[in-house]
Amino acid sequence: MENTIVIKLGGVASDNLTEGFFRQITEWQAANKKIVLVHGGGHYITKMMEALAIPVETKNGLRITNKAALEVTKMVLIGQVQPAITTAFQKRNISVIGLNAGDTGLLEADRLSDTDLGLVGKITKVKTNLIEQLLSENIITVIAPLGINSEHDWLNVNADTAACEVASALHAEALYLLTDVPGVKNGSEIINEIATAEIEKLQKTGVIKGGMIPKLASAAFAAENGVDQVIITNSLETIGTKIKSKVAIG
């Protein structure tokens, strides 16, 4: 969809919702840009799981999700994080609506082949009609990263992956993956640009590790599937690291 910008809010979503953030959103809307947000919630999910004495485990930067963890994830994302985000927009008189996989089967998903991860899925289809209808009315959509499979079972989905799938399905002009660091670092230095062909090498050499591994894999997917600009940063006001779809030289 022309003039669409997708933003993935970080695990501590409230950290991203600064006055500068809303100022940029307002400027984009004034320029007829359409805004879609996909939010994480890992920090709050972990806190709730610890409070309920549910073990917190990860593998390759992804949360291992059993039935108890999935119920907590749904509760926190839909009942806590998403309403906090939409309320922040409403306080500034910005039209917004929260959506999840239960809304007309918005995000269809299949379970990942790595069964060690449990009830974790990958988006297979984004039903864009509802999103596009809301965007045409200048309503910002805020989407929780949960999917539903063909048997109507809910699945936890990595928020970066969900944001990239949504951006690709909408043919967004830009995707911002907001995180807790100002870009991809090599030591203490921010890398300005990374070609998708360089990502595997950066992972093997240890430059990319932990949660940045699935984040960059998702960013590469978006860059190679129709999203013009893919940027990893901690703020809409920070340049961050641009992920480009091109072959590395040398």
Curated annotation (Swiss-Prot):
Gene3D superfamilies, alphabetically? Answer: Acetylglutamate kinase-like
Q: What class of enzyme is it?
A: transferase
UniProt xrefs under SUPFAM superfamilies: Carbamate kinase-like
Determine if Amino-acid biosynthesis is one of this entry's keywords: yes
Give the site residues for Transition state stabilizer: K8, K215
Show the GO MF annotations.
Answer: acetylglutamate kinase activity; ATP binding
Pathway given for this chain reads:
Amino-acid biosynthesis; L-arginine biosynthesis; N(2)-acetyl-L-ornithine from L-glutamate: step 2/4
What keywords is this UniProt entry annotated with? Amino-acid biosynthesis, Arginine biosynthesis, ATP-binding, Cytoplasm, Kinase, Nucleotide-binding, Transferase
* GO terms for biological process, alphabetical: arginine biosynthetic process via ornithine; L-arginine biosynthetic process
- Mind telling me which GO cellular component terms the entry cites? cytoplasm
Localization of this protein: Cytoplasm
Q: CDD domains, from UniProt?
A: AAK_NAGK-like
The record's listing under InterPro entries reads: AceGlu_kinase-like_sf (IPR036393), AcgluKinase_fam (IPR004662), ArgB (IPR037528), Asp/Glu/Uridylate_kinase (IPR001048)
Principal location listed in the UniProt entry = cytoplasm
- EC number(s) given by UniProt: 2.7.2.8
Residues that hold substrate according to the record: G41, G42, R63, N156
The reactions it catalyses are: N-acetyl-L-glutamate + ATP = N-acetyl-L-glutamyl 5-phosphate + ADP
Q: What does this protein do?
A: Catalyzes the ATP-dependent phosphorylation of N-acetyl-L-glutamate.
**Which PANTHER family does this UniProt record tie to the protein?**
N-ACETYLGLUTAMATE SYNTHASE, N-ACETYLGLUTAMATE SYNTHASE, MITOCHONDRIAL
This chain belongs to the protein called Acetylglutamate kinase
Q: Which gene encodes it?
A: argB
